[in-house]
């Protein structure tokens, strides 16, 4: 599954993030494919697995996203927040910005019919919206 498709960190933090990914592989006994746009710190990660263990995938995503944020990075550098990362938006941008996002959404879309579940959500989304290629 393609679970962590779009994180980016400052170049000086990339070796730390790669170490974190290697530790995640060991901890969860998984293998990953890591690629991206190293020149701008953008990292794509895929699990090498045909199984869909949602608890495992969610744990990996939470741990990795927390590390990216801790290392002054973003979990949505190239492709936007989308459905898979919506549950992490509040942590990424902070409570104040998240509340601002909610207010804007309520003003522009009071019936929540435009892009439901994107960015503003209370549901867990990371495993529900996995890419399978």
Name these PLM-found stretches.
Residues 1-4:
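Gly-rich Lys/Arg/Thr-decorated short loops/hinges at beta-loop-alpha junctions or inter-strand turns
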Residues 7, 13-25, 30, 49-77, ...:
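Phosphate/diphosphate-binding loops
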Residues 8-9, 42:
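A short beta-alpha structural unit
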Residues 37-42, 78-82:
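Short Gly/Ser/Thr- and Asp/Glu-enriched loop/turn motifs at secondary-structure junctions
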């Amino acid at each position: 599954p393609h679970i962590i498709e779009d994180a980016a960190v400052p170049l000086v933090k990339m070796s730390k993030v790669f170490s974190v990914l290697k530790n995640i592989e060991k901890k969860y006994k998984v293998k990953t494919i890591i690629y991206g746009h190293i020149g701008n710190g953008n990292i794509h990660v895929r699990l090498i697995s045909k199984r869909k263990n949602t608890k495992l995938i969610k744990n990996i995503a939470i741990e990795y996203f927390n590390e990216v944020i801790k290392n002054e990075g973003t979990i949505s550098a190239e492709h936007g927040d989308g459905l898979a990362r919506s549950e992490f938006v509040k942590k990424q941008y902070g409570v104040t910005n998240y509340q601002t996002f909610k207010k804007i959404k309520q003003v522009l879309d009071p019936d929540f019919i435009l892009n439901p579940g994107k960015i503003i959500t209370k549901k867990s989304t990371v495993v529900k919206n996995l890419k399978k290629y």
